[in-house]
């Protein structure tokens, strides 16, 4: 296969278009940049559509090994010039390899409490970085996955992908409406712990967590509405001792998830 030298090459244009959410949604594909992330995609047997690489930008054996492994697995690999590759890359000083990966489509109907015993549900998150960081924490504590409720954020936004540090390839992400999720979770027997400044119990005071369970966190700005809080079996609070009135969403999720892990172990 000859080296791609033109910025207007159809394959390059299609890949570049994936910077836009509209194109990611229409195609079901997203871009993955960074050697570690691409290595995780390969390790997780993610559905990699293709790889673009620029030999002039590659300066590590690991990068060359990734390309060799991808080729051995039958993944189409396009060699490009450095200039063409840089038109694809978002990061400064790119490492010379970008993957086009197919999004993993998972719905609530695909999940059962047996194989999804404890997860996180986020109501209307706004920041893709928070979504990626929470997914990374889900991975770290060995939880089951992430549900995005009434969400406008794209979990395949480059910021979310980077913040997940590869966890996006290992754990399911489901998008649903709040009402759809609540109507599904209750019959499945999930115990729902909601985080709220009005919670009746400090998170540290819970001696045991019921399973299967969800940790439900409200939006960065509004928290849980009264209607959303009413769905919870228990509202828990994180103490605020100083002037801050709340924690960053990803930080709050991390605090609660590690508390759950400690009790479950």
Label the predicted regions.
Residues 34, 127-134, 247-252:
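Amphipathic alpha-helical repeat scaffolds
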Residues 99, 137-141, 155-166, 226-265:
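Structured adenosyl-cofactor binding patch, chiefly the S-adenosyl-L-methionine
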């Amino acid at each position: 296969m000859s080296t791609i030298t033109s910025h207007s090459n159809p394959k390059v244009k299609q890949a570049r278009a994936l910077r836009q959410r509209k194109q990611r949604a229409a195609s079901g594909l997203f871009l993955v940049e960074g050697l570690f992330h691409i290595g995780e995609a390969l390790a997780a047997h993610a559905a990699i559509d293709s790889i673009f690489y620029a030999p002039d930008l590659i300066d590590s054996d690991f990068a060359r090994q990734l390309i060799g492994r991808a080729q051995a697995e039958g993944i189409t690999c396009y060699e490009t010039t450095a200039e063409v590759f840089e038109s694809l890359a978002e990061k400064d000083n790119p490492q010379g390899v970008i993957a086009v990966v197919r999004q993993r489509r998972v719905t609530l109907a695909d999940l059962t409490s047996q194989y999804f015993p404890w997860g996180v549900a986020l109501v209307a998150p706004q920041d893709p970085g928070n979504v990626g960081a929470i997914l990374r924490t889900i991975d770290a504590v060995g939880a089951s996955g992430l549900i995005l409720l009434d969400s406008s954020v794209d979990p395949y936004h480059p910021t979310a992908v980077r913040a997940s540090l590869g966890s996006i390839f290992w754990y399911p992400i489901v998008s649903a409406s709040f009402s759809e999720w609540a109507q599904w979770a209750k019959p499945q027997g999930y115990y729902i712990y909601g985080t709220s400044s009005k919670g009746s119990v400090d998170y540290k005071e819970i001696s045991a967590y019921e399973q299967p369970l969800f940790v439900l966190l409200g939006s960065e700005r509004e928290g849980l509405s009264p209607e959303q809080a009413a769905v919870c079996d228990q509202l828990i609070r994180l103490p605020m001792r100083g002037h801050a009135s709340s924690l960053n969403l990803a930080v709050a999720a991390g605090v609660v998830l590690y508390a759950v892990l400690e009790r479950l172990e």
